[in-house]
């Protein structure tokens, strides 16, 4: 396949073969919102940036006065359209990402956004669930990445080299396909 002279590579990582592996939490699972919010507040006090992937966890934080550094949302919770957001941000980005996949370009986009000192909101046309992977790989050591575990609670990843190694291991098992 020729990709030279083409600004956009239309390739994705596909995770159909990894559904079972990806269904378990890859961090600390919080099932109690009070304890979860206390942990996040202490993390902010220690200087950690908070990054959320998912509408529900983003909304829980916002409703409790915590505005994440970066939110990655698709406007849906459990595939159901959610209400409009109450908080607006200075920087808003739009990306496209199909369900069960991660577009190659998302990795560079997330890296650039996370280098920015302002953060913001990434609106995903499609599905954001798997974008925890590029976010975790691009986040700073000590950043907190939060995503929802359906019917269980919120999963908190404290970014370090060990978790990056685990994420790269998952990524190596994914299948590269045309989007």
Swiss-Prot record:
User: Could you tell me what reaction this enzyme catalyses?
Assistant: 3'-dephospho-CoA + GTP = GDP + CoA + H(+)
Look up the domain of life of the source: Archaea
Q: Name one GO biological process term.
A: coenzyme A biosynthetic process
Q: Does the keyword Secreted apply?
A: no
Look up the record and name the pathway of this protein: Cofactor biosynthesis; coenzyme A biosynthesis
Q: Which residues bind GTP?
A: 55, 57, 74, 76, 128
A GO MF annotation of the entry reads: GTP binding
Enzyme Commission number(s) of this protein: 2.7.1.237
Q: What does this protein do?
A: Catalyzes the GTP-dependent phosphorylation of the 3'-hydroxyl group of dephosphocoenzyme A to form coenzyme A (CoA).
What is the name of this protein?
A: GTP-dependent dephospho-CoA kinase
| Gene source species | Saccharolobus solfataricus (strain ATCC 35092 / DSM 1617 / JCM 11322 / P2) (Sulfolobus solfataricus)
